[in-house]
Regions:
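Extracytoplasmic gate region of multi-pass secondary transporters
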Residues: 58-59, 238-292
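Conserved MFS/SLC helix-loop-helix module at the cytosolic interface between two early adjacent transmembrane helices
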Residues: 90-126, 301-304
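Cytoplasmic helix-loop-helix junction between adjacent transmembrane helices
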Residues: 134-172
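C-terminal transmembrane helical hairpin of 12-TM major facilitator-type secondary transporters
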Residues: 301-350
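A late C-terminal transmembrane helix in Major Facilitator Superfamily
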Residues: 357, 361-394
Length: 430
């Protein structure tokens, strides 16, 4: 008889991961759809939108901020935003542990209120280093959402793939909102308002979440429920490695594009469209269309073998990125839309792998470890974006991204197939 066991704060990440990877398909939870009130589900999805919006305000407003702070080129100010992306990744580890062991509801309250206050503080910056400090604070609170909010959302989901897809749509509508809302706020009220308005909205969401989300009971990490059947060690390590490596390369593409697309479109639409607000509207349209891909992919994940679907979407990124590298004007708009559809469409897969293989008791911690590595490394994209574009131009950047997509495809080929997982579960470790 296996004794009951409650994970302790001293439990190592490796031990936690090895104890919970399970060979089942995306699980179907027996809880009813009413376990999370609809208002709570909406607020969790809004939280994802706010998370991505906040982390990209700076990239959208960088031209205006650079001019006020006396920088001749926007590229020279971009490295000051790297702290936000670094903590966006590194902060996922403590956020995930606290989510499992303290509780996901209280951590989401810290997320909403902390993000709002950090944005208000950033709006007061009087120079580049104060701005960098404020952005880093935003990154620290933004780190909470992915390892806490998404596991909380799928904890009781009957169709996890569909839930992840819809949540991904919400997150990337936040990306679109960063392009659209920030563009209009910068033009009409100044860049400081681009931080103040979403900051107040986040605080309001925190108040609503505190009132509408009921207590969640015992934190998942302290549950005495026996762990699921584990994968053999070889497949376990393959799944973890692929999950992390693919997340790194995917995050690099996401950061390069979402942080650089505004200035990219300004450059490639020169002489066609000069209005920054209209550029922001076009970019928001690109992101809105691309976000719909996550809903479609999320539903397909529940029906199609994960490896085959993932590989197809990654391979589709390459030709679109190559076309965007050489496109101009409206042809560029078409190519960029295709590229972003495929980049956004690949996002649900790492979360789907966590739901598929990882027991809920440590799901936030495993997600936090994965995010710390992927976001931590991919934060280099923010630091490199300005210097690379300044030295070599956007054409070189998009060719580099096509190469990164090719690397992702090579990594995904190593992902265990559903058949291999089933056979391993039936026959033990090979």
């Amino acid at each position: 008889m296996t004794p009951d066991r409650s994970p302790s704060l001293a439990e190592t990440p490796a031990a936690a991961a090895e104890a919970v990877l399970a060979p089942q398909p995306l699980p179907v939870n027996t809880a009813t759809a009413d376990d999370h009130p609809r208002a709570v589900v909406r607020l969790l999805n809004i939280g994802h939108a706010l998370d991505h919006l906040f982390i990209l305000i700076f990239a959208t407003a960088v031209g205006s901020i650079a001019a006020e702070f006396g920088f001749a080129r926007w590229e020279d100010l971009m490295p000051y935003g790297v702290g936000a992306f670094f903590l966006f990744g590194l902060g996922s580890v403590p956020a995930g542990r606290l989510g499992d062991l303290w509780g996901r509801r209280p951590m989401m309250l810290v997320f909403f209120f902390g993000l709002g206050v950090a944005a208000l503080v950033t709006s007061l910056a009087q120079g580049p280093w104060q701005l960098a400090a404020g952005l880093t604070l935003i990154g620290a609170f933004a780190a909470i959402y992915h390892p806490v909010g998404i596991p909380m959302l799928v904890q009781r989901a009957r169709q996890p793939g569909a839930v992840i897809g819809l949540n991904g749509l919400a997150g990337n509508l936040g990306v679109a909102g960063a392009a659209l809302l920030t563009g209009f706020l910068v033009q009409w009220l100044g860049w400081r308002a681009a931080f103040v308005v979403p900051g107040l909205a986040s605080i309001a969401c925190g108040v609503a979440f505190a009132r509408l989300c009921p207590p969640q009971g015992e934190p998942p990490g302290r549950s005495r429920k026996p762990p699921a059947v584990v994968l053999p060690r070889a497949l376990l390590m393959r799944a973890l490695t692929v999950m992390t490596a693919a997340a790194v390369t995917g995050s690099l593409l996401f950061n390069f594009t979402t942080n650089g697309n505004t200035q990219f479109m300004v450059e490639r639409f020169a002489g066609v469209i000069e209005d920054p607000a209209l550029i922001g509207l076009l970019l928001a349209a690109v992101y809105a269309v691309a976000s719909l891909a996550q809903v479609v992919v999320g539903r397909l994940i529940d029906r199609v073998p994960l490896k085959r679907l993932y590989l197809g979407i990654i391979l589709a990124q390459i030709p679109w990125l190559l076309l965007a590298a050489v496109g101009q004007g409206w042809w560029l708009f078409v190519a960029l839309t295709g590229a972003m559809v495929c980049i956004f469409g690949a996002i649900p897969f790492t979360d789907a792998m966590i739901v598929k293989y990882v027991d809920d008791r440590v799901r936030s911690r495993v997600a936090g470890m994965r995010l710390a590595v992927s976001f931590g490394i991919s934060s280099a994209a923010v630091w490199l974006l300005g210097p690379v574009v300044k030295a070599s131009g956007f054409t070189t950047l998009f060719l580099l991204m096509a190469g990164i997509a090719l690397c992702t495809a090579a990594v995904v080929l190593w992902l265990p197939s559903d058949r291999a997982v089933r056979e391993a579960a039936a026959g033990g470790e090979r």
